[in-house]
């Protein structure tokens, strides 16, 4: 700042103790920071983290419905009826299933469950079923029920899968047997059957008499004939032959017919699907606790109102969308600019250009004033409430945008058959990557908009005051206005609430402006005179110095001689 400006400011501040009003915004001691598209770690007065990272660490009831733990049985052992799993046969309803990945009781006889992954996926969407007898064992005719030491019940007695019947010869005969099941339940029914593949032709004859038996399974839409494939396979539980178990979901009114002369594992019990829903089969060793949750994962329950979570992708229930980011902070306040230590001349109040105000209560934007009654500060609640409403809408819009788009993708897969739905699980990683990026980009954009909105709100408030005061004040350019008339606290309130009467103070303001302009002109004239005198004196001193320096130089070099005569 040049000497003239300093002198003018000193004269004005000394001669005129003007009333002033400033527009500003809140600043706090908050350490919150957010990222925008162009900046990182921007200080803000407040923010919220949209990503949930906490969970219960336990299995909980989901919306009041308890889960079911399969105990020592795997899903396969439970669904086909391993005799060691009889304690689970009464299960009817669950919110989700829990399977111990190392459960000892699976398929007790060597073999496999066909399309096991698809059946698991089907049961991920079932909430309740009932177990029902499909075909009575006694109706099949001249065959015996088979049992094996590989499948022992809880008493140690040889047995077999409780939902199937293994037919073997009776009185050295195995005639062609045939039965049909008609689904008259009005609901979908899960029907299972199987084929036993002996280790040799001799074993085939021993069990079924016929050397080349067959099994024919027929529905209204397909038919398949099974031949026994003899051979030694890797075994366990003392058995080397093989059993393959099949299943079909029959819709109301459909029927299925079984015809065989050896090797058939016939259906006995099936499952009536009473309610479909959104379920899951979780596999983890965490315990079941007495708790309730809105969202369950294999590592724990999630109870939150946040938009996203990064705990686990395969979550069940009313869950935030999974993203890979561990933190996404959304600005809910304004840019946090600390107040300057020195406020104007002599500690005077200052506007938003010089930083925020730590003393602003119940608002983000407001006014400070200075008059004969002292210094006051007040929030502008109307502009603050509008900003809060905008941010609330912004948060809701983020939730709607993410939910709507994500669910529309999942909806496309739910309209096609189950195998393609299984593919949806496999591409979820790619979908998660896309939505993690989208979520981060959306939050960065919204943070930019929020901070720009706050800046605009402060400028709009400043412009509103400028238009209200008109020529009755001088805009100092820092967010403050120097009033050209006396303005007590009541007058300041009219400026804040927009009821200020400009004409009431116009004459006083006009006189004050003329007085200030006169002081400025006189001050400028005095400054110019002072500068002229200082310039003349300085020039003379420099000239005398040059002359003395020249004389001394000539004397030293012998070119100058002084003669003194008496």
Curated annotation (Swiss-Prot):
InterPro entries: Capsid_hemagglutn, Hemagglutn_HA1_a/b_dom_sf, Hemagglutn_influenz_A, Hemagglutn_influenz_A/B. It is found in: Virion membrane; Host apical cell membrane. This is Hemagglutinin. The keyword Nucleotidyltransferase does not apply. Major glycoprotein, comprises over 80% of the envelope proteins present in virus particle. The extent of infection into host organism is determined by HA. Influenza viruses bud from the apical surface of polarized epithelial cells (e.g. bronchial epithelial cells) into lumen of lungs and are therefore usually pneumotropic. The reason is that HA is cleaved by tryptase clara which is restricted to lungs. However, HAs of H5 and H7 pantropic avian viruses subtypes can be cleaved by furin and subtilisin-type enzymes, allowing the virus to grow in other organs than lungs. The gene is HA. Homotrimer of disulfide-linked HA1-HA2. It comes from Influenza A virus (strain A/Gull/Minnesota/945/1980 H13N6). Residues 554-566 are cytoplasmic. A lipid is attached at residues 555, 565 (S-palmitoyl cysteine). Residues 19-532 are extracellular. One of its GO terms (molecular function) is host cell surface receptor binding.
């Amino acid at each position: 700042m040049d000497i003239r400006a300093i002198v003018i400011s000193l004269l004005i501040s000394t001669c005129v103790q003007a009333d002033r009003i400033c527009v500003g915004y809140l600043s706090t001691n908050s350490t919150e920071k957010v990222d925008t598209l162009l900046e990182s770690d921007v200080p803000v007065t407040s923010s919220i983290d949209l990503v949930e990272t906490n969970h219960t660490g336990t299995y909980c009831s989901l919306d009041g419905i308890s889960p079911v733990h399969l105990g020592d049985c795997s899903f396969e052992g439970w669904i086909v009826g391993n005799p060691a799993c009889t304690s689970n046969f009464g299960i009817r309803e669950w919110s989700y299933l829990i399977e111990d990945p190392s459960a000892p009781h699976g398929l007790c006889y060597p073999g496999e469950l066909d399309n096991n992954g698809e059946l698991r996926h089907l049961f991920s969407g079932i909430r309740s079923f009932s177990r029902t007898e499909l075909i009575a064992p006694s109706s099949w005719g001249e065959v015996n029920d088979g049992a094996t030491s590989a499948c022992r019940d809880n008493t140690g007695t040889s047995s077999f899968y409780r939902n199937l019947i293994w037919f073997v010869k009776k009185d050295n005969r195995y005639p062609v047997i045939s039965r049909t099941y008609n689904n008259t339940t009005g609901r979908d029914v899960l029907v299972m059957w199987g084929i036993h593949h002996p280790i040799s032709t001799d074993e085939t004859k021993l069990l079924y008499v016929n050397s080349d038996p067959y099994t024919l399974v027929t529905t209204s839409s397909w038919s398949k004939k099974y031949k026994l494939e003899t051979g030694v396979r890797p075994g366990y539980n003392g058995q080397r032959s093989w059993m393959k178990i099949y299943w079909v979901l029959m819709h109301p009114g459909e029927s299925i017919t079984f015809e065989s002369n050896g090797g058939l594992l016939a259906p006995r019990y099936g499952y009536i699907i009473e309610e479909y829903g959104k379920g899951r089969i979780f596999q983890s060793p965490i315990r079941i606790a007495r708790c309730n949750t809105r969202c369950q994962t294999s590592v724990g329950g999630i109870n939150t109102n946040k938009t996203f979570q990064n705990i686990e992708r395969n979550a069940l229930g009313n869950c935030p969308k999974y993203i890979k980011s561990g933190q996404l902070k959304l600005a809910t306040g304004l840019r946090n600019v600390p107040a300057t230590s020195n406020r104007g001349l002599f500690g005077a109040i200052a506007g938003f250009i010089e930083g925020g105000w730590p003393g602003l209560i119940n608002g983000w934007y407001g006014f400070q004033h200075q008059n004969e009654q002292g210094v006051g500060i007040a929030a502008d609640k109307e502009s603050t409430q509008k900003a809060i409403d905008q941010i609330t809408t912004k948060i809701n819009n983020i939730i709607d945008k993410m939910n709507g788009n994500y669910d529309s993708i999942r909806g496309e897969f739910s309209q096609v058959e189950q195998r393609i739905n299984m593919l949806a699980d496999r591409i979820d990683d790619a979908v998660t990557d896309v939505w993690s990026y989208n979520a981060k980009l959306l939050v960065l954009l919204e943070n930019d908009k929020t901070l720009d909105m706050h800046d605009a709100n402060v400028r709009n408030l400043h412009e509103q005051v400028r238009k209200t005061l008109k020529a009755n004040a001088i805009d100092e350019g820092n967010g403050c206005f120097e009033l050209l008339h006396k303005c007590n606290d009541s007058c300041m309130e009219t400026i804040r609430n927009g009821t200020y009467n400009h004409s009431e103070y116009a004459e006083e303001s006009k006189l004050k402006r003329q007085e200030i302009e006169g002081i400025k002109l006189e001050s400028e004239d005095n400054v110019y005179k002072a500068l002229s005198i200082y310039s003349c004196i300085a020039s003379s001193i420099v000239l005398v110095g040059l002359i003395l320096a020249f004389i001394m130089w000539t004397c030293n070099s012998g070119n100058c001689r002084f003669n003194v005569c008496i």
